[in-house]
Amino acid sequence: MKFVDEVSIHVKAGDGGNGLMSFRREKFIEKGGPNGGDGGDGGSIYLEADVNLNTLVDYRYTRRFDAQRGENGGSKDCTGAKGDDLILPVPVGTTVIDANTQEIIGDLTEPGQRLMVAQGGWHGLGNTRFKSSTNRAPRQTTPGKPGEARDLKLELKVLADVGLLGLPNAGKSTFIRAVSAAKPKVADYPFTTLVPNLGVVSVGRYKSFVVADIPGLIEGAAEGAGLGIRFLKHLARTRILLHLVDMAPLDESDPADAAEVIVRELGRFSPALTERERWLVLNKMDQILDPAEREARKQAVIERLGWEGPVYVISALERDGTEALSQDIMRYLDERTLRLEEDPQYAEELAELDRRIEDEARARLQALDDARALRRSGLKNAGAVDDDDFDDEEDDGDGPEIFYVP
């Protein structure tokens, strides 16, 4: 199944049925009077969050959806049948945006939640409606109203409690394998992870949280380089971010430099996202045998970042330190939930932060889309470099194929 997290579709609700002009005509009833019925309402279009879906790939191939038109009115005061509503299933976590105004129509965050995106047309009136004491044989009717038509943009953001940040090969997928039953692909080359992966982490007998891994970020990601920038939006709804740093990289690069790249690119993508609760997780420390060297590398990263938050030293491969980290995450999430219920000011501050993150992420991605459109139309700036992989339509046949649908 191909992972598609953005699509554009056109929806058209059903038109209302026309009212009928008709008169009662029976033997021995010379002037039976009007009996034209009303038309039926047009069908509306709804989006429904379906917990069994995790991609918008179905809407990549079919992009126009029309609801059924209401039937016209009939004689003998018969009302036309209402057009059937059209229900379009989408994954939980889908944001619906009006493509013309960029207005957010709604957010589908709960299984079974429905959102009307196109209102069916109102029915027309038959001539019976216009009968009066002075007009006993009206010849007036009204047509049905046209159904609402809209161009929509659907954006999927996975719903997770914890988001993982890091360069390619920082050990994010290995971490998910260590703490959950998820089995994302793991290898010793960059960009092994091509789509977001989710894992459910069980803590104790009855508690759990969801962790999301996205493709790694690289230098220049905020300008569209690599794969990770497109998927950073999936971290917008997380409650806490884990910044994983490879402390023993194969190319012997400085871990402090790698950590600094992530913080810088995160800030360029969304300054508000840097205000989200974030913990520093130093991975692969088991590969550094000298305790003094281990401590020196740890302090170098902390000092370079000016870090004052929580720091964890783990080995995802050996599962060393992962259990304690998972328990602390669960404890933080429980305390956060309790505080949200008891402190309205804290809840409002988090809601405002969420809004800022959503707005900044959408603005950044829209800017990248606009720049890509300019390049494709031959107006590429002299200094611009089209180094992202999302307009690559060739299938190399190796691994999953990724589609970005503008």
Swiss-Prot record:
Family statement: Belongs to the TRAFAC class OBG-HflX-like GTPase superfamily. OBG GTPase family.
Protein's organism: Pseudomonas aeruginosa (strain UCBPP-PA14)
Keyword Transcription in annotation: no
Domain OBG-type G: 160-334
Keywords noted in UniProt: Cytoplasm, GTP-binding, Hydrolase, Magnesium, Metal-binding, Nucleotide-binding
Positions of region (Disordered): 127-148, 382-406
Sequence positions that bind GTP: 166-173, 191-195, 213-216, 283-286, 315-317
Listed EC numbers: 3.6.5.-
Cofactor dependence: Mg(2+)
UniProt biased composition (Acidic residues): 385-399
Protein name as it appears in the record: GTPase Obg
GO biological process: ribosome biogenesis
GO molecular function: GTP binding; GTPase activity; magnesium ion binding
Binding site for Mg(2+): 173, 193
Function of the molecule: An essential GTPase which binds GTP, GDP and possibly (p)ppGpp with moderate affinity, with high nucleotide exchange rates and a fairly low GTP hydrolysis rate. It may play a role in control of the cell cycle, stress response, ribosome biogenesis and in those bacteria that undergo differentiation, in morphogenesis control. Overexpression increases bacterial persistence in both stationary phase and biofilms in response to a number of antibiotics.
